[in-house]
Structures are given as structure tokens and as C-alpha cells.
UniProtKB/Swiss-Prot annotation:
Gene3D superfamilies: Viral capsid, core domain supefamily, Hepatitis B virus. It comes from the Viruses. Homodimerizes, then multimerizes. Interacts with cytosol exposed regions of viral L glycoprotein present in the reticulum-to-Golgi compartment. Interacts with human FLNB. Phosphorylated form interacts with host importin alpha; this interaction depends on the exposure of the NLS, which itself depends upon genome maturation and/or phosphorylation of the capsid protein. Interacts with host NUP153. InterPro entries: Hepatitis_core, Viral_capsid_core_dom_sf_HBV. It comes from Woolly monkey hepatitis B virus (isolate Louisville) (WMHBV). Disulfide bonds: none annotated. Keywords: Capsid protein, Cytoplasmic inwards viral transport, DNA-binding, Host cytoplasm, Host-virus interaction, Microtubular inwards viral transport, Phosphoprotein, Repeat, RNA-binding, T=4 icosahedral capsid protein, Viral penetration into host nucleus, Virion, Virus entry into host cell. Residues 149-175 have a biased composition (Basic residues). Residues 161-176 are annotated as: 2 X 8 AA repeats of S-P-R-R-R-[PR]-S-Q. It is found in: Virion; Host cytoplasm. The lineage of its organism: Viruses, Riboviria, Pararnavirae, Artverviricota, Revtraviricetes. This is Capsid protein.
Length: 182
């Protein structure tokens, strides 16, 4: 079976596979991040979102894979064979788990559309010859200007907008008019 774990989220394995392996943080760092940001939702019996479910399943799979790796490490007597198994798990399975964890944590943190936009921007950047591309790669946290603005609006607005000022001005004039002082 050819199952793409990103398909229902609007991405593909190919879209994530162009990112270099060292792009993704370690599994431990990603698990710590997921725990710090989403522990309550991940441990809840309630369904939060498909990303929470996928993240939960990825964490469980990693745990099972580590149990298997521990068993192999304990029961495989040939050091060369043991090293081969550990290397395979780290290089192949570890990368897939890091990709999955990064994708779902990023989607929960920044929003799916932002992450997909970032992946496409990075894909275009990395495939553009160095002489024709900007020196710095796109950065996920700075890519969506609108997301940053939306997050700042409630606490960041200290002065009323021009529309608000216009609607308040006539009321002030009425209350200060000579007729209201009588």
C-alpha cells in the first residue's frame, strides 16, 4: 500500500522530502515541544483536530518503535547487526517521525495554510539557482505577515482607527454643543 500521511492535510511526502534531514529538529526536541504546547489536548479523550490526532498517533508510533529498538538492542548479540538496526531506525524511521512531528506541530502553531505556503516558498527558493535567489531562505515564523498582524491586533491597538475616530467625533460635538449645556 502506498499511503501518504500528509494527503488529507493538503501536502505530500514529496513536498516535505525536499527539505534536508538537518532541517528538522531532533525527535526529543519535537516531543518536548509537542508536550509543552499541546500536552492537554494530546492527553485528552476529546477530539481536538485531525492534526492533534495525527500528532498523537505519531508520538505513540515513536514510543512503540523505541520499545522495539530497545528489545533488539538487548536481544541482538552481534554488535555489527545491532548497529545496522539502530542506524536504519535513526536514519529512516527517525527522519519520517521528525517530518511528521514537525509538520503537525507547525500546522497547529502557525496554521495549515501558512505551513503549506512556507513549504512551497521554500521549495521554490531551494530550486532556484543561487545566483537568482535571495540569500536567505524563507522563515516559517516570519512568512505570514497577516497571521502576525491578526495575533497582535487585540493587544496591539492603542489608538483608535480612523473609522472609530470619525464615528465618535459627532457624538462629542453633540455633547459639547450649547443646546446640551442648557
Amino acid at each position: 500500500m502506498d499511503i501518504d500521511p500528509y494527503k488529507e492535510f493538503g501536502a505530500t511526502v514529496e513536498l516535505l522530502s525536499f527539505l534536508p534531514a538537518d532541517f528538522f529538529p531532533s525527535v526529543r526536541d519535537l516531543l518536548d515541544t509537542a508536550s509543552a504546547l499541546y500536552r492537554e489536548a494530546l492527553e485528552s479523550s476529546d477530539h481536538c483536530s485531525p492534526h492533534h490526532t495525527a500528532l498523537r498517533q505519531t508520538v505513540l508510533c515513536w514510543g512503540e518503535l523505541m520499545s522495539l529498538a530497545s528489545w533488539v538492542g538487548t536481544n541482538l548479540e552481534d554488535p555489527a547487526a545491532r548497529e545496522l538496526v539502530v542506524s536504519y531506525v535513526n536514519d529512516n524511521m527517525g527522519l519520517k517521525v521528525r517530518q511528521l512531528l514537525w509538520f503537525h506541530i507547525s500546522c497547529l502553531t502557525f496554521g495549515r495554510e501558512t505551513v503549506l505556503e512556507y513549504l512551497v516558498s521554500f521549495w521554490v527558493w531551494i530550486r532556484t539557482p543561487p545566483a537568482y535567489r535571495p540569500p536567505n531562505a524563507p522563515i516559517l515564523s516570519t512568512l505570514p505577515e497577516t497571521t502576525v498582524v491578526r495575533r497582535r491586533r487585540p493587544s496591539g491597538r492603542r489608538t483608535p482607527s480612523p473609522r472609530r475616530r470619525r464615528s465618535q467625533s459627532p457624538r462629542r460635538r453633540r455633547s459639547q454643543s450649547p443646546a446640551s449645556s442648557c
